[in-house]
Amino acid sequence: MARRLISSGSTFERDIGYSRAVVDGDWIFVSGTTGFDYATMTISDNLLDQTDQCLKNIDAALRQAGSSLRDVVRVTYVLPNGDEFPKCWPVLKKYFGEVRPAAMMISAGLADPKMRIEIEVTALKQ
């Protein structure tokens, strides 16, 4: 099976030169995804809203790949302020509470100071 590239239409993908996701066989690798609404290229100041939008963006990429959040096997969370991570848990549990992928949280700077969380996932089509 040929490698397939998935785009969200984000200007970041075009400007930087990457794909929102790459499908290789049954594996789907979703790039680090932030809380921007790609239709308007706007981002909320609210951490929970950003977290929710991240996961909506990821779900859209997975659906383009013929998959869903239920197929996520690994997730990495990146927050500039690691102390804020517990605030995200209710939103994360809403999406991953039954899926329970392997997970890691990293505290590191992000590309834009408006970004408060970035999420990267790997999924295996079932």
Map each language-model feature to its residues.
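Short, polar/acidic, helix-capping and beta-turn segments at strand->helix junctions
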Residues: 1-126
